[in-house]
Every structure is written in structure tokens, then in C-alpha cells.
């Protein structure tokens, strides 16, 4: 009986371990992107897009790369190749679980993607973080840094022609801090 319990415990430990770490990476990616949005030394530019300025895709690609998900290392460079590479790096397509009109179902860390035009990341409470446009309403030629407070910013979810929503494994939640694996001893 003891050997069987140990075998079952090991099975479930191994099974659940494949999802461990997802929430920490989600939090790291979200927090990094929000930090960039809150720092006016970073603005929008499609020419100088890997820091200190970013465009919509480079902001999210760099956020996930910094969080330990190797999307940039695996070739993600723009909205047109994000879907395939993000899926290969542990994301799943959860578009069918989302009401794209209202944003209902979008979770913290979800990538909202229009493959041709734009991407943003859900940060919870009906909010997204995104890089939008430079101070002239364009994509290139602005000054370094955020001149308007809305070049890279957080805003409410909005209805956009999103093609898909990608979620990192074990996405959206925060791991409870006081959960321990214990051995059950019958009384």
C-alpha cells in the first residue's frame, strides 16, 4: 500500500510540475511591460525598437524573453511571426474562450494579437499594456522616450480585430504561496 501511494504521489508531482513556473514567468513579463510603460524614458519607435524605445511587438517579445520564455531567441521579431513562435514556446491559443468584443475571459499575461497590425498584453482587471504610436501619431521619427504618456501605456481593454489570444501555460493565475506537498498518513 505504501509503495502504491508513493507511486501515485510521484506521478501527480511530476504531472503538476510541468506547469510550475508559468505564473512566475507571467508575472515577470507583465511587470516588466508595465514598468516600461510607467517609465517615460521609453517611447514608441519602429526603427529603434529594442530599447530604449519599443513598438507593440518588440515590447511584448522583450517582456517574455526577459521573463525566461525564449520567444526572441527562437526568432520572434514582429506581429507576423509571433503566433507561431509563441505557440512553440509554451503558449496555447485560447481565442475560443474569449469574448473579443468585451474582453471577457482575458487573463493576466494573455497576448492579444492581430497578426498584421498590432499586439497588446492583458494585465488583469480589464486592462492591457501596449506600445501604440509616437508623439506625432506615427511609427517612426519621434524623439526617444514617451512624449505623450501614451506611446507605451496601460489602458482599458478595447474591441479590436484581434486574430487570436495566446496564453502561457498555467496562465492568468498566481500560485498560492502556502501550498506544500505533504505525505498523507491515514488516521
Predicted regions span which residues?
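Catalytic Cys-His active-site segments of thiol-dependent hydrolases/isopeptidases
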Residues: 73, 121-154
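N-terminal capping segments
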Residues: 1-77, 95, 107, 115-118, ...
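Residue-level detector of flexible, active-site-proximal loop/helix-junction positions
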Residues: 98, 135, 172
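Acidic, glycine-rich loop-and-strand cores that form catalytic or ligand-binding grooves
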Residues: 81-83
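Short, well-ordered loop/turn sites that connect or cap secondary structure elements
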Residues: 100, 104-107
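Surface-exposed intrinsically disordered loops and tails
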Residues: 85-100, 139-157
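Low-complexity, Gly/Ser/Thr/Pro-rich intrinsically disordered linker/tail segments
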Residues: 153-187
